[in-house]
């Protein structure tokens, strides 16, 4: 939900309590003796308020004849100022007996500010404690009551504060954050603040040190944290709970800074004077939560709301849609990759959660990493078997970056979501919108036309008959062991869902990522009929079992059934460790490929492995796609383009024939003579 640009304040209460006088005192900045019974609606323009929103102030009457206007006004209110007269105790009694129950009966669910007017008529002094004791029973029973303000329209005194608290109740409401009955943070607020603490804890040591607190302060309030302020924060938290302030681990980076400066601002000294270090202590999550509880209890809700909004939260304490899914347009024929900033952020977060520094993320480390998000986005896709892991099945940095490269290529929206969840926009290294972590590539057609591919991630569709060894190829690509039984038999499992794997291939010192997708018989035809899905493919890998006489026919039939010649292709003959079988096809695979102008099928064995030469060959095709287009340059046209070309030639031929016919008729030829003339012209008749 976006921030409001209008705050509608409605004043309600018994007649004679001074509602109209409060409004006129605000506008005139002085008491006005003769005021209308109901003041017309007042609009305060946005430039008057520091937060740049329009304020509308509506007066009402409790007269029964004005009841429709009263009910209409409170139904459209963003906040209600319920006014009573300190000089008339019965008007205070009616707050709980009449007015607040009326709001509930009418289904009004907005903040209420209790306003005690005419304090100039009170006899004797009332302490803050006395005022709190008087209003506490009402606030306990009616949670919609945000605060109590006393004022005098006559003096005037505290009049502007009435409207300040009313505006604040709308822009920075207490109800979503704090349970005033239990005196605790509400669950959603607690969850959000815990996530913010985790993201702000850059080194993931469970503490916010001086450097991290300064970065937090800069992000949320655009001002550095002074050393005295930090000392005060530590003292406040320590007085609440000594265990909420802990010594920093020896490995925690806490940059030494000048004590007369702000933490986080680095100074260099040439006089050999070593500046004092910042406190070697940090606040725990408990201490961080206590600070925000204290802010709210002190009426400083705007502090907590500023923090929440800076970290992407909306009024409902959910991450905003525009924060999770910002506008990011991808032109047709282009793909999306991680930018250098995105790669660096994902590298940094991997290293931060690799607590044992063994170069791989265990399951517990992965769980911690995704704790600020809805969870691991790849669980249903077979992760971590989709990428590179160590011998114990733990994802490595290479596999981690490869997995994100695949995710970004296949569904960049997921990457944008998770960059937000993981704190990219809150990272001290970036503090930039999440789209800066992504990069839109040049169109494929432009790459092919200029014969220079600028992309780094390529999508390869793996097609072939059931049992041809497609899944084994995918497993081999991510260094998974061969699953076949004796003599390659007994280990076959049919593919029932889309399988995607990713790995990098080094070409002349540069890493390129290949994403291999297998669809299985259930989804293959659906993909091949979908022109948009086909256009996403950089390469088609046609796989046949060289030991199965019927395997290659499947590929030939597939190519006849679907228009695939506009996609670069490579043919692979699997199970080369078994006896070569003569294919039941009009021509053998090598001849078939030669007729297409392609290399003969590469013979491979997933059982014997490794298949490095195959991956290099596929990457070469990706980098020089025009060299592997079936039947040469004409095949670069998509099926739709071919239809348009044929239609244009057909139209041209029809037009020419019509012109010739008209001309010949004008010359006096009969149609029989015309066809004879045309045949003679074509050399078909002697």
UniProtKB/Swiss-Prot annotation:
Residues 666-686 are mitochondrial intermembrane. GO terms for biological process: heme transport; mitochondrion inheritance; mitochondrion organization; mitochondrion-endoplasmic reticulum membrane tethering; phospholipid homeostasis; regulation of mitochondrion organization. Its EC number is 3.6.5.-. GTP 1 binds at residues 13-20, 59-63, 117-120. The keyword tRNA processing does not apply. Mitochondrial GTPase involved in mitochondrial trafficking. Probably involved in control of anterograde transport of mitochondria and their subcellular distribution. This is Mitochondrial Rho GTPase 1. The gene is GEM1.
